[in-house]
Amino acid sequence: MGMSKAERIAALLGSLKKENKFEQIANVIDKVSIKESDQIREIVPIEEWINSEYYCGADGVKKLYPFWKDLICDIFRDGKQNYNQIVLTGGIGTGKSTCGLYIVLRKLYELSCYKNVAGLFGLMSNTMTAFLYFSLTKYQAERSGFAQLRSIIDGIPYFKERFQRNKYRNSTLDFPENIRLFYGSSTADMIGMNVISAIIDEANFFGDSSGSEVDLGSVEELYNSVLSRTSSRFTSNGVNNSLNLVISSSTFKTSLTSKLYDKSLTDPSIRYARARLWDIKPQGTYKNEYFY
């Protein structure tokens, strides 16, 4: 049995030093306000989860290519999250954006198996845990990846029966435990938020193949801000629990994806995956064809 709240307060007050007592008392109040988290459901192993219509929906099981399923299993293998940064790149039609959404869904699912999610990370119980989907404009985000994410969630039995969102709001996805999914277009949309996970789909920031409509450096600046915020909020006991994704088409050669590729060669926290159509499509799709 652990100590009662009164016993915890007494023990903490008894440890105070004479100097800076008011500051120390404020710290005591913060500590007793942080409740521990309890696991309320067993977390289904990733290999079972990704092939279950109950957890991923019929579309996830039947339409997510094996290439991406294998990647998702690698990210969450052995019952833990093995990377903090995921870079998905490849040609149009390879399913990389959809894969990114299912990676985020796995993170959401794992959090849903706990009571007092904030306590997992040493945060106060009323702390909001936020996910963000970024696009060039909020309007574009709402009608692209965020809308797809909402549609996927609404078709999954688990999120209908065990962890249901507020169906009266579609501009954000509000779940129990003060977990919320937002969309945004700039660093300003993160102000005041405890962001645990974000997706930046680079293709949404470009008007054409040259990327001339937006300063490509601003995308890198946004991503660096995301990394800083997520790691500072959700690093607990030396473990970084954040999960951030960059999704980029092979059409675009950007400094961000190039830098992340170079970093991935030596940084074990980054997973870089490049999909080619002949890797993705079912065997026989390109029979007797050659690629140069």
Where are these regions (language model features)?
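Phosphate/NTP-binding elements of NTP-utilizing enzymes
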Residues: 1-292
